[in-house]
A protein has these predicted regions:
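Alpha-helical transmembrane segments of compact multi-pass small-molecule transporters, enriched
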Residues: 43-49, 98-112, 187-191, 222-226, ...
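Membrane-interface interhelical linkers
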Residues: 1-17, 24-25, 29-71, 80-90, ...
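Helix-loop junctions at the membrane-solvent interface of multi-pass transporters
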Residues: 17, 52-56, 112-117, 135-139, ...
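Hydrophobic/small/kink-forming positions within alpha-helical transmembrane segments
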Residues: 15, 19, 23, 50, ...
Length: 281
């Protein structure tokens, strides 16, 4: 298998596990605060990462790698809170699509500047992949927006934050993936706890930690796959394929909750498969 094929495969695994994480978090959010679920997942997965790193006696990387990871974890958690706020304001379908597109577009632009232009086939795959992300992420939710323009602005800001996190994670992973994940998770826990402290959850649910464990674990595994993918190939390829994670959420919702995807989302999934084939070449 070529390095591009391996990177694409790891990117797909990242998208699948991130999609599962979002599904678990979304399911739990029907019963408890999404921030409470996120906080519990971050804390519990951090404990697991610390145990693994210490048990394996992994060498702690240089401070710069840990700092990059911590910045990515902190600003990614803040971006998540901003994204939740944007969705709550309305224009949910368009906001989610814009966030997904910006998440992939930021590392694509960064890598084009930093690494130069890829082959024509890769460029075509990236373009199709970005279109797929837009279609997959767009949901038919009722708009009823409190402030559509502000919701879209916050959604775009969240997407930029998520995209920046992908860039930072690639840099941090060069020093050691597991310690990078741990550093990012520590900073993420701090950020989420700050957000929860400023806006205490109103819907406690004794079983929220179950959704938190599943969501947090899958999110950490998805981060692991993404970091590995980013080390084996171009950043833009890893970022675009990994950003197709809403497809995994949609498929799980269809299988478990019997929720049918829209024609737009089905078309997006088809384009995503075509994009992956091109990016694996």
């Amino acid at each position: 298998m070529t390095s591009s094929g391996a990177a694409a495969g790891l990117g797909l695994l990242s998208a699948a596990t991130w999609g599962g994480s979002d599904f678990a978090g979304g399911w739990g959010a029907r019963r408890a605060s999404s921030l409470l679920i996120t906080a519990s997942g971050q804390i519990l997965s951090l404990a697991g990462l610390l145990v693994i790193c210490l048990a394996l006696r992994l060498t702690i990387p240089g401070a710069s790698y840990l700092v990059y990871a911590a910045i990515g974890g902190f600003e990614g958690a803040i971006a998540l809170a901003v994204f939740y706020r944007a969705l709550a304001m309305g224009a949910m379908g368009l906001t989610a699509a814009l966030t997904g597109l910006m998440t992939a577009l930021v590392p694509v632009v960064f890598d084009l500047i930093h690494s130069g232009w890829p082959t024509a086939i890769t460029m075509l795959g990236l373009a199709i992949g970005l279109a797929a992300i837009w279609l997959i992420s767009h949901s038919p939710a009722k708009e009823g927006a409190e402030s559509p323009r502000r919701a879209l602005f916050l959604g775009a800001c969240a997407g930029v934050g998520f995209g920046a996190q992908l860039i930072l994670f690639k840099t941090a992973a060069a020093g050691g993936v597991l310690w990078a994940l741990t550093s990012a998770r520590i900073a993420g826990v701090v950020a989420i706890l700050l957000v929860v402290a400023m806006a205490p959850p109103k819907r406690p649910w004794r079983g929220f930690w179950i959704a938190g464990v599943v969501s947090g674990t899958l999110d950490a595994v998805g981060n692991l796959f993404y970091m590995l993918a980013s080390q084996m190939g171009r950043l833009d390829v890893a970022a675009v394929i990994s950003s197709m994670y809403p497809a995994g959420t949609i498929l799980l919702a269809g299988i478990i909750l019997r929720e049918h995807p829209t024609k737009r989302q089905v078309a997006g999934i088809g384009l995503a498969l075509a994009a992956v084939a091109l990016l694996s070449a």
